[in-house]
């Protein structure tokens, strides 16, 4: 009993310390967004004893930068690319987990799909830019949607393949014995059972697409297609960095 009573405070303090350690950068960023430039660079740092200001938020949302436009662009690009990647990758993952292929072709296809995700995006950004320039897609949201979808499909394929392999084939076979089709059993039985996998995979795709910066800089030029990551980068110039704006 004494040992258990001793463990509880230790566990609680460990959790509190972990939370503070994890949240400190975020909380400090929030405090920076309310500081004037002089207080941002004050030494020693001022964590609480500063005069708050909304200057950076006004500059971000209502002054010179169309931040709401960038938010809408990011939302459109992220949501559409995630939906497309989920549709294509889920079907591909189902195919690799259920269908038969000649010889070792299935493993070659699976490795090829995985290898496309191994490449750093910076390796293919120039060919992609030339390709999109040829078709007049540079500075459009469609270019970002295609790029993000292409890079998320391998991830979705491998994630959903592993989830489908954990679902017994007998469930589909019994449904098809009762007269259902392959796609019918996939839609009515497999997909509902794979909802946790779809949810986890979609969250990862949303995060990857929302935070992507390289293609957002290379493939967009104006506010018509600029995203949030590009807008944040506007805070860094040749001579200074507007930390208050970027924190806001």
Indicate residue ranges for each PLM-predicted region.
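A structural signal for multi-pass alpha-helical bundles of membrane permease subunits
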Residues: 2-248
